[in-house]
A protein has these predicted regions:
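Hydrophobic h-region of N-terminal signal peptides that target proteins for export
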Residues: 13-23
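Bacterial N-terminal signal peptides that target proteins for export
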Residues: 1-11
């Protein structure tokens, strides 16, 4: 009889311990709605911590077809219409030198261009080793005190020219906080 009363206690503790361990093992992930210059929701962004960077998943509709620059910006502030409130690209060094193909680059917010199909939609998963969610490996943290944003630009990034590779206006923004 005593055995039946005592056995549930260790089993309960084991289950609680396993649940806590599983919760600790889950990677840090944040999502945000992509909004257009008129404030309408165009899609969704999810950024998830990975062992050596972050995985970005993005789905969007309502954009002009073609290539668009895509960057992590330094503030989770997507005030329309121009999204200038999102600040500059995420960076750890100054002065910031832009360009994924630039051998002198130190711009941690750089990402590959996004291709939008003829129907105005795009879905993509991208991996960046330049940033982290919380500062792992000394990389800039997307979840710092003021968060960050994923910004889509009107034009493609040429990966070389300063300051933003000719990517032009900001046409969509998603806060990450």
């Amino acid at each position: 009889m005593l055995f039946r009363r005592i056995l549930p206690i260790p089993m309960t503790l084991l289950v609680l311990g396993l649940a806590a361990a599983a919760a600790e093992a889950a990677p840090v992930s944040r999502s945000g709605n992509l909004v257009g210059a008129d404030g309408t929701t165009l899609g969704k962004v999810t950024v998830t911590e990975a062992p050596h960077g972050v995985l970005l998943r993005l789905s969007v509709e309502g954009l002009m077809p073609g290539w668009h620059g895509l960057h992590f910006h330094e503030k989770a502030d997507c005030e329309a219409p121009g999204f200038k409130s999102a600040g500059s690209h995420v960076h750890a060094a100054t002065p910031v030198v832009h360009g994924l193909m630039n051998p002198e680059a130190n711009d941690d917010g750089d990402l590959p261009n996004l291709y939008v199909g003829a129907d105005g939609t795009a879905m993509v998963e991208l991996y960046s080793t330049l940033v982290s969610m919380q500062g792992a490996g000394g990389r800039p943290a997307l979840l710092d005190a003021d968060g960050s944003a994923v910004v889509i630009h009107a034009n493609p990034d040429d990966y070389m020219s300063q300051p933003i590779g000719g990517a032009g206006d900001r046409v969509a923004c998603a806060p990450i906080k």
